[in-house]
Amino acid sequence: MSQFSFTKMHGLGNSYIYVNMFEEQIPEEDLVLVAEKVSNINTGIGADGMILICPSDVAPVKMRMFNNDGSEGKSCGNGLRCVAKYAYEHKLVEETVFTIETLAGIVTAEVTVEEGKVTLAKIDMGAPRLTRAEIPMLGEGETPFIRENFLYNNHRYAFTAVSMGNPHAVIFVDDVEQAPLTTLGPVLETHEMFPERVNVEFIEILNDAEMNFRVWERGSGVTQACGTGACAAVVAAILNGKMERGKEITVHLAGGDLMIAWTEEGNVLMKGPAEVICRGVYEYKIEA
């Protein structure tokens, strides 16, 4: 029987099991199964996935993120805010502005601290990737993929594709509560045009500074929030002429609000909370 200490944290209800790999050890060959086991709501702790906080050669810390199906993602906005909180509060970093390595690249985090605790985290998510090769999608072309039609159940849905280190398909609807989240979501997620699968967001524009947001996450299904998805949604809204670049947008997710801005300089900034749920020790056994 093996075990490790964990901290369960969430960003707007998007929860992960966080493991401090500066102190713990999980064999590389076990990570996929451990992520599946620990995320299981019935036989594990229950979460949207597992995130490892690891040493890095190029930043103070490195984030590795696994979905609850065991697949490894390149980035996670809500996860980054929680990693930033954990790193500062556990003295893995000393400054309130620092970098985090991800499989999608290095991002900059800035934490707001009150009485030694991080209350907000702002992440510079970098520039969005908009070409088919960058997202990635099948096909050729260097122009952004904006409002392309997808036929489902005899209805045409126009989606815009954006990568924020992971792929997103953003669909604008009149009412997110009526959107085909659990039906169209998995169909589009696994469509052959997306070789690495895709996260699917449904967006309802409320005004020039607010939107409602629902998400079907690649590898996890319906979740309460998706930070990279909120960033992709704001980028897509600006590309479609629905919102203004350089302005801070409030994204209302099922789990709460994020503040997102696509700056004139090109990077996307995300600001929101990160909270600890519980801590403990998880025991597991990998069958031979």
Swiss-Prot record:
Q: Which SUPFAM superfamilies match?
A: Diaminopimelate epimerase-like
Cleavable signal peptide: none
Localized where?
Answer: Cytoplasm
Name the Enzyme Commission number(s) assigned to this protein: 5.1.1.7
Alphabetically sorted, this entry's keywords are:
Amino-acid biosynthesis, Cytoplasm, Isomerase, Lysine biosynthesis
Gene3D superfamilies noted in UniProt: Diaminopimelate Epimerase, Chain A, domain 1
Pathway annotation from the record: Amino-acid biosynthesis; L-lysine biosynthesis via DAP pathway; DL-2,6-diaminopimelate from LL-2,6-diaminopimelate: step 1/1
What Gene Ontology cellular component terms go with this record? cytosol
Q: Which GO terms describe its biological process?
A: lysine biosynthetic process via diaminopimelate
Kindly give the Pfam families that the UniProt entry links to this protein. Answer: DAP_epimerase (PF01678)
Catalytic activity reported: (2S,6S)-2,6-diaminopimelate = meso-2,6-diaminopimelate
List the disulfide bonds in this chain. none
Q: Where is this site: Could be important to modulate the pK values of the two catalytic cysteine residues?
A: H168, E217
Catalytic residues in the record: C76, C226
Output the Gene Ontology terms for molecular function.
diaminopimelate epimerase activity
Assembly and interaction partners = Homodimer.
Which family, according to UniProt?
Answer: Belongs to the diaminopimelate epimerase family.
In terms of PANTHER family, this protein maps to: DIAMINOPIMELATE EPIMERASE, DIAMINOPIMELATE EPIMERASE, CHLOROPLASTIC
User: What does this gene product do?
Assistant: Catalyzes the stereoinversion of LL-2,6-diaminopimelate (L,L-DAP) to meso-diaminopimelate (meso-DAP), a precursor of L-lysine and an essential component of the bacterial peptidoglycan.
The entry's protein name is Diaminopimelate epimerase
Lineage of producing organism: Bacteria, Bacillati, Bacillota, Bacilli, Bacillales
